[in-house]
């Protein structure tokens, strides 16, 4: 898949504000500070998502219209401790409603920091997606910060840690070096049925 056009078309804080489900969409989820905004900028080819050094900056569901025919959906980062209980509850309700009602959702790309083993909330997200029957794949971000041997070892360790849930696609990725960019876009294209 080639991205030749991308624009932020909607920022959603309430489930009733979601755009109509008239296009296939792929969502991107991950812990706060996993590099989701940098990842989106890399795959979209333009600086469209705000990159922040403060984790948990994305507090809304952000809809990007890609090539005028697909939605790339940036979900709020999970696991950031310094937001209020009320805000966390709002996020939970929003996410729950989104996953349960969004029939145009083709798959979720779950971003995991390649440098670290998955945490409790990552496993909780996998269990949740499995229970809902939502297809998902793993993108291992910040791969450029590892040596070749560290990368290989952690790749296998992370894969093994999720193996009890089933067989999934795992792709190392670096927003800095663009490692994995072609593979990620190819996989997203296959999921969306786009052969460009």
Curated annotation (Swiss-Prot):
Mg(2+) binds at residues 37, 58. One of its GO terms (molecular function) is GTP binding. GTP binds at residues 30-37, 56-60, 74-77, 141-144, 173-175. One of its GO terms (cellular component) is cytosol. The keyword tRNA processing does not apply. Its cofactor is Mg(2+). InterPro entries: G_ENGB_dom, GTP-bd, GTP-bd_ribosome_bio_YsxC, P-loop_NTPase, Small_GTP-bd. Gene3D superfamilies: P-loop containing nucleotide triphosphate hydrolases. Residues 22-194 form the EngB-type G domain. Keywords: Cell cycle, Cell division, GTP-binding, Magnesium, Metal-binding, Nucleotide-binding, Septation. GO terms for biological process: division septum assembly. Belongs to the TRAFAC class TrmE-Era-EngA-EngB-Septin-like GTPase superfamily. EngB GTPase family. Necessary for normal cell division and for the maintenance of normal septation. This is Probable GTP-binding protein EngB. It comes from Petrotoga mobilis (strain DSM 10674 / SJ95).
